Curated annotation (Swiss-Prot):
Top-tier EC class: transferase
Organism name: Paraburkholderia phytofirmans (strain DSM 17436 / LMG 22146 / PsJN)
Gene Ontology terms: biological process: queuosine biosynthetic process; tRNA wobble guanine modification
Gene3D superfamilies registered for this protein in UniProt: QueA-like (3.40.1780.10)
The reaction(s) this protein catalyses: 7-aminomethyl-7-carbaguanosine(34) in tRNA + S-adenosyl-L-methionine = epoxyqueuosine(34) in tRNA + adenine + L-methionine + 2 H(+)
Cited function: Transfers and isomerizes the ribose moiety from AdoMet to the 7-aminomethyl group of 7-deazaguanine (preQ1-tRNA) to give epoxyqueuosine (oQ-tRNA).
NCBIfam families from the UniProt entry: PRK00147.1, queA
Organism ancestry: Bacteria, Pseudomonadati, Pseudomonadota, Betaproteobacteria, Burkholderiales
Record keywords: Cytoplasm, Queuosine biosynthesis, S-adenosyl-L-methionine, Transferase
Pathway named in the protein's UniProt entry: tRNA modification; tRNA-queuosine biosynthesis
Name by which UniProt lists this protein: S-adenosylmethionine:tRNA ribosyltransferase-isomerase
Gene: queA
Length: 352
């Protein structure tokens, strides 16, 4: 049985990308081509991300996550004058949101907090591990006007105007995430146009990435880990495109682990209900580890993930544990850039 320690590796800190490259598609792409069937080593091909159209067949379907990152981080003050840090996790209504709150002493329901020295919110009920916050006006408007972009904890600079552009995908449409679907950051309009010209199909879903994506796994036995929950919407048009892709013998390619989680969660629920994949708008806490049976995704575009993370477990389940170990060894030797602003992989499902 695999344990948390099986997903650890040593990463030189200088390989953690701190800034985005000047051009989105100038990042590197490590193509990991698993052989047909389960046997044999994968072929590793060093590329540039701009070469992605060469790796994809006409008629294949790319599935993107069109979530948009909120300016969800605030510094504030309690009525007592104590400093507080707030990270909005999820919008729950026009004037309400769930948030993480860091303070020397937990705020009590009914108390007010001043955010960004601009407006007051009222603390409502506790919804573990979050607090309900009541805003004085439309919370999305206030968040976008006064909040700060919530860069990941391993990025060591304060967000600037470059981050406000580059920590969003060019196809971001639906505000609600507190972290970017980072595989999508490599796509620019010119690359999307080249994919269209080749006859590659495109479709979108929405999964609002939560702060839980950065939470470490704290138990050695993976079965004891409680996965965070995230909301997603899979439109019927995407379900229809997937069925058509399957019917003509083409492959479904998830852009990012967030797209993967939404697709596989919807397919698993559909299978359990004895029906074909269809539109879905719901929560998922799907935890994909080696041994999981993939139902939809044939290939995956994804960045390089943190040691001991649930996303490293996901890609290991998808491409094979040994394949991912060899891929990461190669990436470190070849000085690929890691994490959100880093380079990418194109993985093929091990049994595909």
């Amino acid at each position: 049985m695999l344990t948390l320690s099986d997903f650890d590796f040593d990463l030189p800190p200088e390989l953690i990308a701190q800034v985005a490259l000047p051009e989105r598609s100038a990042s590197r792409l490590l193509e990991v081509d698993n052989p047909a069937g389960a046997a044999g080593p994968a072929r590793l091909i060093d590329r540039r991300f701009a070469e992605l159209p060469e790796c994809i067949a006409p008629g294949d379907l790319l599935v993107f996550n069109d979530t948009k990152v909120l300016k969800a981080r605030f510094l504030g003050q309690k009525a007592s004058g104590g400093k507080i840090e707030v990270l909005v996790e999820r919008l729950t209504g026009e004037r309400t949101a769930l948030a993480q709150i860091r303070a020397s002493k937990s705020p009590q329901p009914g108390t007010t907090i001043r955010l960004a020295d601009a407006f007051d919110v009222t603390v409502g009920e506790r919804v573990e591990p979050f607090y309900t916050l009541h805003f004085p006006d439309d919370c999305l408007t206030l968040i976008e006007q006064f909040g700060r972009l919530p860069l990941p904890p391993y990025i060591e600079h304060d967000p600037d105007s470059t981050d406000e552009t580059r920590y969003q995908t060019v196809f971001a449409q639906n505000p609600g995430a507190v972290a970017a679907p980072t595989a999508g950051l490599h796509f620019d309009d010119a690359l999307l146009a080249r994919l269209d010209e080749k006859g590659v199909e495109r479709a979108t879903l929405t999964l609002h990435v939560g702060a839980g994506t950065f939470q470490p796994v704290r138990v050695e036995n993976l079965a004891e880990h409680k996965m965070h929950s995230e909301w997603y919407h899979l439109p019927q048009a995407l379900a229809d495109k997937i069925a058509a892709t399957r019917a003509r013998g083409n492959r479904v390619i998830a852009v990012g682990t967030t797209s993967m989680r939404a697709l596989e969660a919807a397919a698993r629920d559909a299978e359990a209900a004895g029906r074909p994949l269809a539109a879905a708008s719901t929560e998922t806490d799907i935890f994909i580890t080696p041994g999981y049976k993939f139902r939809v995704v044939d290939r995956l575009v994804t960045n390089f993930h943190l040691p001991k993370s649930t996303l490293l477990m996901l890609v290991s389940a998808f491409a094979g544990v040994e394949t991912i170990r060899e891929t990461y060894r190669h990436a470190i030797e070849q000085r690929y850039r890691f994490f959100s602003y880093g380079d990418a992989m194109l993985l093929t499902r091990r049994d595909a």
